[in-house]
Amino acid sequence: MTAILERRESTSLWGRFCNWITSTENRLYIGWFGVLMIPTLLTATSVFIIAFIAAPPVDIDGIREPVSGSLLYGNNIISGAIIPTSAAIGLHFYPIWEAASVDEWLYNGGPYELIVLHFLLGVACYMGREWELSFRLGMRPWIAVAYSAPVAAATAVFLIYPIGQGSFSDGMPLGISGTFNFMIVFQAEHNILMHPFHMLGVAGVFGGSLFSAMHGSLVTSSLIRETTENESANEGYRFGQEEETYNIVAAHGYFGRLIFQYASFNNSRSLHFFLAAWPVVGIWFTALGISTMAFNLNGFNFNQSVVDSQGRVINTWADIINRANLGMEVMHERNAHNFPLDLAAVEAPSTNG
């Protein structure tokens, strides 16, 4: 009898690392995108927490008037924010080693640029990690495609808009009231409410909420009863069961009679594709709208577009919005310039004397 002993090849340390990184048996999948995602998101999160608590005021407008954003400098959870990098820095890459000191780096809002750039890289890698895990499990790639919508929106407000406006100081502050301030100023300067891409985004978000609520309530109302009246209907479901958990025919019939027949999906797959695609496409359009308005391709301007036979203006809601925009622009950066840009651009009347 002859025994053949096969020598087991020793796997290198790099090989074991590659196998561990790409293994779908791990409790949390890491993947090659995760190798970059983990340090970037940890860096962004750590600096955000420290800066939100203790960062000193930042000279956001570049006029030696620092704005406080951290908790230790008088703010609360609502008013606190990471103040964007100073207009004096503009679009320059501003890591710590480019400043003369850490104090100067903090005064010019260096943490904002650090957080934003690491965050955008991290969420892009998270999207790639979703695709990578789907690929290794033999799934279709639509999870990553859906996640591309919020990634595009974040990239638009944190990167594309500052590039178009010429300074990171125009980026969205990282805080609750800072976000509201960004929205108000954006409306004042770009008339975003009158931009069709923003309208599509509103339809996507509100429509997606409506469709999600309709779908969830229809499914919950047409569950196949597997329990007694004294038990929760949820107890009748077992994870991984092959049987349908709700009666799609009953849900289809109800909704078809509630509105009209063809308003109801009779294909569960096309229904769920629609539920995913509607808000995703809407948010894509919003991100595209922000990116175009970044370069001052603004919303529609219907100011003074209705006049009577004598040429007198008949005010419409467009004129009311325009007046509100001017008021918001007057209050924005009120110490950085004497007049809002729209008013300062008007040619001064000639004087005789």
Swiss-Prot record:
<feature type="binding site">
    <location>
        <position position="126"/>
    </location>
    <ligand>
        <name>pheophytin a</name>
    </ligand>
</feature>
<keyword id="KW-0150">Chloroplast</keyword>
<feature type="transmembrane region" description="Helical">
    <location>
        <begin position="197"/>
        <end position="218"/>
    </location>
</feature>
<dbReference type="GO" id="GO:0009523">
    <property type="term" value="C:photosystem II"/>
</dbReference>
<feature type="binding site">
    <location>
        <position position="333"/>
    </location>
    <ligand>
        <name>[CaMn4O5] cluster</name>
    </ligand>
</feature>
<feature type="binding site" description="axial binding residue">
    <location>
        <position position="118"/>
    </location>
    <ligand>
        <name>chlorophyll a ChlzD1</name>
    </ligand>
</feature>
<feature type="binding site">
    <location>
        <position position="189"/>
    </location>
    <ligand>
        <name>[CaMn4O5] cluster</name>
    </ligand>
</feature>
<keyword id="KW-0472">Membrane</keyword>
<comment type="subunit">
    <text>PSII is composed of 1 copy each of membrane proteins PsbA, PsbB, PsbC, PsbD, PsbE, PsbF, PsbH, PsbI, PsbJ, PsbK, PsbL, PsbM, PsbT, PsbX, PsbY, PsbZ, Psb30/Ycf12, at least 3 peripheral proteins of the oxygen-evolving complex and a large number of cofactors. It forms dimeric complexes.</text>
</comment>
<keyword id="KW-0460">Magnesium</keyword>
<feature type="binding site">
    <location>
        <position position="215"/>
    </location>
    <ligand>
        <name>a quinone</name>
    </ligand>
</feature>
<feature type="binding site">
    <location>
        <position position="344"/>
    </location>
    <ligand>
        <name>[CaMn4O5] cluster</name>
    </ligand>
</feature>
<feature type="transmembrane region" description="Helical">
    <location>
        <begin position="118"/>
        <end position="133"/>
    </location>
</feature>
<comment type="function">
    <text>Photosystem II (PSII) is a light-driven water:plastoquinone oxidoreductase that uses light energy to abstract electrons from H(2)O, generating O(2) and a proton gradient subsequently used for ATP formation. It consists of a core antenna complex that captures photons, and an electron transfer chain that converts photonic excitation into a charge separation. The D1/D2 (PsbA/PsbD) reaction center heterodimer binds P680, the primary electron donor of PSII as well as several subsequent electron acceptors.</text>
</comment>
<keyword id="KW-0157">Chromophore</keyword>
<feature type="binding site">
    <location>
        <position position="215"/>
    </location>
    <ligand>
        <name>Fe cation</name>
    </ligand>
</feature>
<feature type="propeptide">
    <location>
        <begin position="345"/>
        <end position="353"/>
    </location>
</feature>
<dbReference type="InterPro" id="IPR000484">
    <property type="entry name" value="Photo_RC_L/M"/>
</dbReference>
<feature type="site" description="Cleavage; by CTPA">
    <location>
        <begin position="344"/>
        <end position="345"/>
    </location>
</feature>
<feature type="transmembrane region" description="Helical">
    <location>
        <begin position="29"/>
        <end position="46"/>
    </location>
</feature>
<dbReference type="InterPro" id="IPR036854">
    <property type="entry name" value="Photo_II_D1/D2_sf"/>
</dbReference>
<keyword id="KW-0106">Calcium</keyword>
<feature type="binding site">
    <location>
        <position position="332"/>
    </location>
    <ligand>
        <name>[CaMn4O5] cluster</name>
    </ligand>
</feature>
<keyword id="KW-0793">Thylakoid</keyword>
<feature type="site" description="Stabilizes free radical intermediate">
    <location>
        <position position="190"/>
    </location>
</feature>
<keyword id="KW-0249">Electron transport</keyword>
<keyword id="KW-0007">Acetylation</keyword>
<keyword id="KW-0359">Herbicide resistance</keyword>
<dbReference type="GO" id="GO:0009635">
    <property type="term" value="P:response to herbicide"/>
</dbReference>
<dbReference type="GO" id="GO:0009772">
    <property type="term" value="P:photosynthetic electron transport in photosystem II"/>
</dbReference>
<dbReference type="GO" id="GO:0016168">
    <property type="term" value="F:chlorophyll binding"/>
</dbReference>
<keyword id="KW-0597">Phosphoprotein</keyword>
<feature type="modified residue" description="N-acetylthreonine">
    <location>
        <position position="2"/>
    </location>
</feature>
<dbReference type="GO" id="GO:0005506">
    <property type="term" value="F:iron ion binding"/>
</dbReference>
<feature type="modified residue" description="Phosphothreonine">
    <location>
        <position position="2"/>
    </location>
</feature>
<keyword id="KW-0464">Manganese</keyword>
<dbReference type="Pfam" id="PF00124">
    <property type="entry name" value="Photo_RC"/>
</dbReference>
<dbReference type="GO" id="GO:0009535">
    <property type="term" value="C:chloroplast thylakoid membrane"/>
</dbReference>
<keyword id="KW-0479">Metal-binding</keyword>
<keyword id="KW-1133">Transmembrane helix</keyword>
<feature type="transmembrane region" description="Helical">
    <location>
        <begin position="274"/>
        <end position="288"/>
    </location>
</feature>
<dbReference type="GO" id="GO:0010242">
    <property type="term" value="F:oxygen evolving activity"/>
</dbReference>
